[in-house]
């Protein structure tokens, strides 16, 4: 199974990538944005997620069966100070990945954040309606 981890050099991506590589049957390819990874145990692609042409190229070359989307601007303060850029990356980038997954018949696994909830209640469940109170949560 060909797995593409978009945002594979981030905190969750690094651990997920290692686990998948250790298991047989997974051909793992990952992307990074600003810092090239130090390990060379698999294929890496440089990707600025708002570069739709580059994203198209990666999908054509990798031909993933599964895409795990982890790329985002996740620092709340950075998002609040640069809302337009955060929307481009976190919303438009995700939309493009979703479109390409549909086009290439790849399953999409998208991880989100607890910031989609207001945070005043706690113990949220998967079927609770989102009610973000930050731009990061909205993106």
Task: Label each residue range with its predicted role.
Residues 1-23:
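N-terminal Rossmann NAD(P)H-binding glycine-rich loop of SDR-like oxidoreductase domains
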Residues 24, 62, 103-104:
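Helix C-cap/helix->beta junction micro-motif
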Residues 88-96, 116-139:
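Catalytic helix-loop patch of NAD(P)-dependent Rossmann-fold dehydrogenases
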Residues 6, 31, 67-71, 108-113, ...:
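SDR active-site strand-loop-helix element
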Residues 23-29:
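A generic structural motif
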Residues 30-37, 48-49:
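N-terminal Rossmann-fold cofactor-binding loop
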Residues 67, 81-109:
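NAD(P)-cofactor binding segment of oxidoreductase domains
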Residues 46-89:
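NAD(P)H-binding glycine-rich loop region in Rossmannoid oxidoreductase-like domains
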């Amino acid at each position: 199974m060909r797995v593409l981890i978009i945002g594979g050099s981030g905190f969750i991506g690094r651990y997920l990538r290692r686990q998948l590589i250790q298991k047989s049957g997974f051909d793992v390819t990952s992307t990074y944005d600003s810092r090239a990874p130090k390990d060379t145990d698999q294929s890496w692609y440089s990707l600025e997620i708002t570069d739709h042409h580059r994203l198209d190229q990666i999908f054509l070359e990798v031909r993933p069966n599964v895409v795990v989307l982890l790329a985002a601007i996740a620092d709340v303060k950075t998002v609040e100070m640069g809302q337009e850029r955060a929307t481009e990356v976190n919303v438009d980038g995700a939309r493009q990945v979703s479109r390409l997954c549909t086009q290439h018949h790849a399953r999409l696994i998208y991880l989100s954040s607890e910031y989609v909830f207001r945070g005043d209640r706690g113990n949220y469940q998967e079927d609770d309606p989102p009610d973000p109170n930050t731009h990061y949560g909205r993106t």
